[in-house]
Amino acid sequence: MNRGFSRKSHTFLPKIFFRKMSSSGAKDKPELQFPFLQDEDTVATLLECKTLFILRGLPGSGKSTLARVIVDKYRDGTKMVSADAYKITPGARGAFSEEYKRLDEDLAAYCRRRDIRILVLDDTNHERERLEQLFEMADQYQYQVVLVEPKTAWRLDCAQLKEKNQWQLSADDLKKLKPGLEKDFLPLYFGWFLTKKSSETLRKAGQVFLEELGNHKAFKKELRQFVPGDEPREKMDLVTYFGKRPPGVLHCTTKFCDYGKAPGAEEYAQQDVLKKSYSKAFTLTISALFVTPKTTGARVELSEQQLQLWPSDVDKLSPTDNLPRGSRAHITLGCAADVEAVQTGLDLLEILRQEKGGSRGEEVGELSRGKLYSLGNGRWMLTLAKNMEVRAIFTGYYGKGKPVPTQGSRKGGALQSCTII
């Protein structure tokens, strides 16, 4: 008689054997078709990031099963925090303020640990106010956020969920929770968020560029573009000048959504290509670094696949512009005082519009990474001799984009607060 396999009857088999069995079975289940479970390149990339998976859904919809699959997939460096463990009944949070306080304290403690890269929060998360608290915590500890909702066929069917949920909630109880989960929760913006390693590599390249440019004789002749008034200056520290720098990991914005209020945000978020790409790993190509009196950034050359995620209406400074799609793709590396990060993309479009008009500027020499061009009006472009490739996860930024106290795992560091730009 074939008794089949069981962990109990085959104690001599290594754990990896059973992990492969479970992962191969997951590939056949439509409710587990997520890039972070199915795409090994994405799995490897996420292990280089700090990611908070926030599960959302009605009781009985399959959140806990999905949470366990995520933990099983990533294993080491992963922790799950479940509302069930704190005896929190799904519904209004007011009756469980002490329980949520303990949950948040434990979640924050995990965020502070250096050995944890993946955090999984299992709760209904149907209230905007609650989600905003979690997004602020993610900002504080510099975690990227991935919102995950079960794909089970019954996830919004209160009649079926009544039978499946462990809390014995009635169909009416479930219907009260449903409105907050029927609509997608849109971020402040979507984009590609670089891994920690890629962020550090690009940030370092940007800093070397600023140091070399600041010492270049051609730049010294044009200092008046960066120094106010008639203040005499023979040299300037561009690293200090662009002191308003993105904390944590760098990113390349695709669509500014303003939580769904921006024009075209809902339509953008409903695209099939976005839904399939959300939480997926990509490799971005950097072809140039640039400086203007207001910003410094990296130009991103998007592939055909990546261009599918690029909005069709963001590559123009004026209605008559006809720049190629993806022209504005960039990564902000720093801004001058009182300059917002949105200016970086506008500066890049100005440079590319000038190039299209036939003026690439004057080649003034070579730096360690490529040729330096002076474009006039304090604008400089370093065309890389060898393109840089950076790894990134496509997701959303859901926080407020305002300064919050940061508590990274590194000791020291210049940044005392986190401003997402």
Curated annotation (Swiss-Prot):
Pfam families: AAA_33 (PF13671), CNPase (PF05881). Substrate binds at T253, T332. It is found in: Membrane; Melanosome. InterPro entries: CNPase (IPR008431), CNPase_cat (IPR047325), Cyclic_Pdiesterase (IPR009097), P-loop_NTPase (IPR027417). Its EC number is 3.1.4.37. Changing S82L: In HLD20; uncertain significance; decreased protein levels in patient cells. It is a lipid-anchor. The modification Phosphotyrosine is found at Y110. Residues 419-421 form a propeptide. The modification Cysteine methyl ester is found at C418. It catalyses: a nucleoside 2',3'-cyclic phosphate + H2O = a nucleoside 2'-phosphate + H(+). GO terms for cellular component: cytoplasm; extracellular exosome; extracellular space; melanosome; membrane; microtubule; myelin sheath; synapse. The keyword Lipoprotein applies. Keywords: Hydrolase, Leukodystrophy, Lipoprotein, Membrane, Methylation, Neurodegeneration, Phosphoprotein, Prenylation, RNA-binding. The active site is at H251, H330. It comes from the Eukaryota. A lipid is attached at C418 (S-farnesyl cysteine). Belongs to the 2H phosphoesterase superfamily. CNPase family. It is linked to Leukodystrophy, hypomyelinating, 20: An autosomal recessive disorder characterized by neuroregression and loss of motor, language and cognitive skills, after a normal early development. Disease onset is between 12 and 18 month of age. Patients show poor overall growth, microcephaly, feeding difficulties and spastic quadriplegia. Some patients may have seizures. Death in childhood may occur. Hypomyelinating leukodystrophy with subcortical and periventricular white matter abnormalities is seen on brain imaging. Exists as monomers and homodimers. PANTHER family: 2',3'-CYCLIC-NUCLEOTIDE 3'-PHOSPHODIESTERASE (PTHR10156:SF0). This is 2',3'-cyclic-nucleotide 3'-phosphodiesterase. The gene is CNP.
